[in-house]
C-alpha cells in the first residue's frame, strides 16, 4: 500500500481514504465553521426580533451541527460574527483588532420604522438615524428580513451587493394546529360557545400595529370576540403608552388583552382564532403571521406592499377598517368560506419552513466565511 506523509494536527481538514477497485479516492472533509452570534434581543420580552433570533439559533444547533459550531455572545475568534442587535458595545467591538471573521449585520429595522413604535425625542432622532446607519456601515455584509429595506439601505449609501434578503421562519414542532377537542376546551375555559366568532391579533401594543383599528372594530362589532396578545415590550418608551394603557385597563367587554404571553399560550390563541387579523400600517417581517400560518389560522391583513412581495396573495387583503369590518361579518355569516384562507395559510407555512431556510443559511455562511478568508 502506498504510504502517505504525516499531516500536521493543525491541518484544517481530514483525509478520508476510500478504495474503489485499484483507485484511491481522497475526500477532504472541511472543518466546521464557527459562527458567533451577538444579540441582546431576548432581554426584551414579547417582540419579534427575539423570536426570530431564537428560531435561527435553535435550528442551527439542531440541524447544522455537522457543518457549524454556533456560539452566543462570546468574545472569541470566529469565521463569522453575526450581529443581531445594534448595541453600542457591539459597535465598539467592530473597531477591535481581534479576529472576529466576517462581520454580518441583521437588519430588523430602519430609523424610519421606529416611528409609531417608540417615543424618541425630536432632538435625538437625527442622532439615532446616524448611529443606526453607522452601525450597518461597519458590517461587511447585511441580511434584511424585509426585502423593502434594500432600496432604503442603498439610498443611505450601502452598496446593493452588500445586502442579502433572507426571510424569517418558524418551527413547525412549536407552532402547529391543536386537536379540535383541545380547541373546545379552550373556548369553554374562556366561557365562549362553539359558534362564537373569534378574531385574534398579536404584537406589541403600539400605533403602527393598527391597534386603534382593532379596538374600534371591537367597539363596532360587540357580537364578535376580539383578543389581542401582546403588551408594552419597551414600557413607557412605547409611542402612545398612556393612551393604550388606559384602554387595556378598561377595554370593551368583547375585547380581551391577555398581555405578553408564553409561546404555549400563544399557540392556544392561534388555535382559538376563526380569523387572525393584523391591521398594521407598517411592518418589518412579522413573526406572528408566520406563527399563525403554521397553526393554520386564516389570515387577514391591511393591504401593504410588503405582503404582496412576501406572501403572494395567501391572505385576505383589506384597505382599511371598513373593509375589515365587512370581511369579519362575511366570515361570521358564512364560516365555510374561511377554508380557502386556511389552505392559503398552509402555503405560507410551507414557503417559510425551517427545511426551506436551513440550506439558504448554510450556503450564506459558507460564502461569507470564504470571503472573510481572502
Swiss-Prot record:
It is found in: Cell membrane. Its EC number is 2.4.1.-. It catalyses: a 1,2-diacyl-3-O-(alpha-D-glucopyranosyl)-sn-glycerol + UDP-alpha-D-galactose = a 1,2-diacyl-3-O-[alpha-D-galactopyranosyl-(1->2)-alpha-D-glucopyranosyl]-sn-glycerol + UDP + H(+). One of its GO terms (cellular component) is plasma membrane. Its cofactor is Mg(2+). GO terms for molecular function: hexosyltransferase activity. PANTHER family: GLYCOSYLTRANSFERASE WBBK-RELATED. This is Alpha-galactosylglucosyldiacylglycerol synthase. It comes from Streptococcus pneumoniae (strain ATCC BAA-255 / R6).
Amino acid at each position: 500500500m502506498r504510504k502517505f506523509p504525516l499531516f500536521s494536527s493543525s491541518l484544517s481538514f481530514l483525509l478520508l481514504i476510500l478504495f474503489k477497485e485499484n483507485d484511491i479516492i481522497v475526500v477532504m472533509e472541511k472543518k466546521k465553521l464557527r459562527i458567533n452570534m451577538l444579540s441582546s434581543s431576548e432581554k426584551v420580552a414579547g417582540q419579534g426580533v427575539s423570536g426570530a433570533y431564537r428560531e435561527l439559533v435553535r435550528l442551527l444547533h439542531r440541524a447544522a451541527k455537522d457543518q457549524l459550531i454556533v456560539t452566543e455572545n462570546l468574545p472569541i475568534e470566529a469565521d463569522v460574527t453575526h450581529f443581531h442587535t445594534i448595541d453600542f458595545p457591539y459597535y465598539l467591538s467592530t473597531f477591535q483588532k481581534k479576529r472576529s471573521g466576517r462581520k454580518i449585520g441583521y437588519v430588523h429595522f430602519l430609523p424610519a420604522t421606529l416611528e409609531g413604535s417608540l417615543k424618541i425625542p425630536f432632538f435625538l432622532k437625527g442622532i439615532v438615524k446616524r448611529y443606526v446607519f453607522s452601525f450597518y456601515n461597519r458590517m461587511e455584509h447585511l441580511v434584511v428580513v424585509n426585502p423593502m429595506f434594500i432600496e432604503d439601505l442603498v439610498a443611505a449609501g450601502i452598496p446593493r451587493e452588500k445586502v442579502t434578503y433572507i426571510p424569517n421562519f418558524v418551527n413547525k414542532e412549536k407552532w402547529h394546529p391543536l386537536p379540535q377537542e383541545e380547541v373546545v376546551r379552550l373556548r369553554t375555559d374562556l366561557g365562549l360557545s362553539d359558534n362564537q366568532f373569534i378574531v385574534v391579533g398579536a404584537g406589541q401594543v403600539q400605533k403602527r400595529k393598527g391597534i386603534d383599528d382593532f379596538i374600534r372594530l371591537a367597539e363596532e362589532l360587540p357580537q364578535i370576540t376580539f383578543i389581542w396578545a401582546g403588551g408594552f415590550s419597551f414600557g413607557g418608551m412605547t409611542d402612545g403608552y398612556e393612551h393604550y394603557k388606559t384602554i387595556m385597563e378598561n377595554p370593551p367587554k368583547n375585547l380581551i388583552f391577555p398581555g405578553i404571553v408564553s409561546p404555549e399560550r400563544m399557540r392556544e390563541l392561534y388555535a382559538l382564532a376563526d380569523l387572525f387579523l393584523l391591521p398594521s400600517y407598517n411592518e418589518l417581517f412579522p413573526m406572528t403571521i408566520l406563527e399563525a400560518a403554521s397553526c393554520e389560522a386564516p389570515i387577514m391583513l391591511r393591504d401593504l406592499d410588503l405582503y404582496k412581495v412576501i406572501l403572494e396573495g395567501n391572505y385576505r387583503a383589506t384597505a382599511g377598517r371598513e373593509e375589515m369590518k365587512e370581511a369579519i361579518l362575511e366570515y361570521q355569516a358564512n364560516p365555510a368560506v374561511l377554508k380557502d384562507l386556511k389552505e392559503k395559510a398552509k402555503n405560507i407555512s410551507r414557503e417559510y419552513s425551517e427545511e426551506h431556510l436551513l440550506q439558504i443559511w448554510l450556503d450564506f455562511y459558507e460564502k461569507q466565511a470564504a470571503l472573510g478568508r481572502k
